């Protein structure tokens, strides 16, 4: 295990030598919008051609089109990008923000805490060198994407996300790639295709948010809403006992490479302010925070000493740095705290427990609730979106869907309507630990109480028995709630409940949650979601191994697993794998049946067993002997169509196959007759 110093040195080396992190056989490309500076980043996965006939000397191939996929990595996946984390990313949206003429550049920062940090020369070695001047709305102006949408304005950001969400699916014309079963959307109204006007309508109605602080122009526009692709958030951040600025920047880059749509900086240790500046200046995705964490650091961790003034200054500090969305635990009310007394695991939300302790200590109402109007006014001046935190979320499935959880949800519904009065974009955070049978009730209640504001859930975790594997236990619930209508999933890593995640944990959590999000998109019937599935399935059936790896979410791992058993280069074109071997590969057998049908000029679906001539290449006596042997084995096994794999008939050797059903009994024969019968059975 690496020491802390070694880990920091490795992270430093990573960012010093940072080059674009490309997936194999992929290429970054840009779709052009309606203006020269509107170029929407995507990734194309190139495929090899399919051999469909001809001869060894003159083979005939069928071309397979490149598959376009969503790309969160910004410049980090562009081989032509000049990356320097000390300089930060290109300010993609600066011109769009400036030309609206509703913001002003400030001569100095507004936060008293930020002014103190800038005056401290002892922090110079940690500071991001090229600090931009912050912007704020002009007096009396509102600069949120919701505000523009409600006034009928389609911004460049809205056009950007419309192009991005469609993923160029109009270019996919192959019927085999476009096929899909009807989805069940549970009332979601999916745009087909997604247009800038559709995006505007969803933002205006509050059913979606476009989280983009005017002080984070480096971020590429993305949208969160149940009528769009399900998004995934990754959490990073240092703590009082581990991690450094270098490691957090490394984790940010790594997270976007593996598909994080947004990143939350949950730092609680030293240098929170400086760490966040480095993260924002180098982030192509929206950044979220929980401001109460930093406010607590400012009062030395004593919750009772928190004040509205300290918290307000923290909001201004973070808004002027460029934080795109705040998690605010304004729904933890004094009267709800006693409801948690009977819980198995009490209050498990850090923000929720901080505010509960403050309420009890002062016996006053939550100051975040009391000052919510001022919070909204502040957010409207920077276009910071609100993520209303679920401080009463259950920390075990025993506490799921209890009185405290749903009481807070009702209050969040009240607060989202108030935020909309200020044109502040808002999402609702959700649980937590919920068994499968209670998940849909959470989604249904949220839609009802919060007027379809986007739902953002941590999992939910469906069982509590698997520390070290909570990316699995929660991934199950995440897939379900994504299908029911959740707009964004907060990933869970293998280290959940155990420790701070490292790079590999971040990757594992993201892969698990990208699977869950995609499964939800397919189940909802999102147009175009299944194209990648179909392309990979076609590659699998045609034994295009490299295409199978490259079309997957994690090509490196897929290739490594295949290489463990079949490392030879020849295995990359073989028509079998180590799972079944060359004799029992179902897809190979199916292909042989299709080839037979083609030779007979017959529709493969119309083949009858009697049509297959199995006597042409095997002696008749051998065939009859094999058939007699299999007949005897079937009778000795009790003449049962299906029976247990561990059952062994007298006088008959046990087989290595997992099942001795009629199908596997036929397969056990090495005669050509049994192979032909199995081919017909597969059809």
Curated annotation (Swiss-Prot):
One of its GO terms (cellular component) is cytosol. Residues 653-675 have a biased composition (Low complexity). Disulfide bonds: none annotated. Zn(2+) binds at residues 433, 497. Residues 647-683 are annotated as: Disordered. GO terms for molecular function: 4 iron, 4 sulfur cluster binding; carbon-carbon lyase activity; zinc ion binding. Keywords: 4Fe-4S, Iron, Iron-sulfur, Lyase, Metal-binding, S-adenosyl-L-methionine, Thiamine biosynthesis, Zinc. Gene3D superfamilies: 6.10.250.620, Radical SAM ThiC family, central domain. Pathway: Cofactor biosynthesis; thiamine diphosphate biosynthesis. Homodimer. Catalyzes the synthesis of the hydroxymethylpyrimidine phosphate (HMP-P) moiety of thiamine from aminoimidazole ribotide (AIR) in a radical S-adenosyl-L-methionine (SAM)-dependent reaction. Belongs to the ThiC family. This is Phosphomethylpyrimidine synthase. It comes from Shewanella loihica (strain ATCC BAA-1088 / PV-4).
